[in-house]
Amino acid sequence: MQIHGTCDPRFAPVREAFEGNFKDGLEVGASVAVTRDGVPVVDLWAGEAVQGGAPWQRDTIVNVYSTTKTMAAISVLVLADRG
């Protein structure tokens, strides 16, 4: 599986875990992006947008289902912690 994109060497374990999901058959297609202090440090994508279909692209649009609930909860907890 060819992994596309960029990854700061300090975040090599993120790339390794991302690639490992494909090697273990856990992913058909995926992307991951991480910023640190507003600077992109990981921007990776690989696989297929639909199994047996078009390759995943940097701008492939996906349904994130209920991920917003988790992000909202984490945001509220961080704000509460900061007072």
What is the meaning of each model-derived region?
Residues 52-83:
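Active-site-proximal loop and beta-strand segments within enzyme catalytic domains
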Residues 4-64:
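Short, conserved catalytic-motif segment at the N-terminal edge
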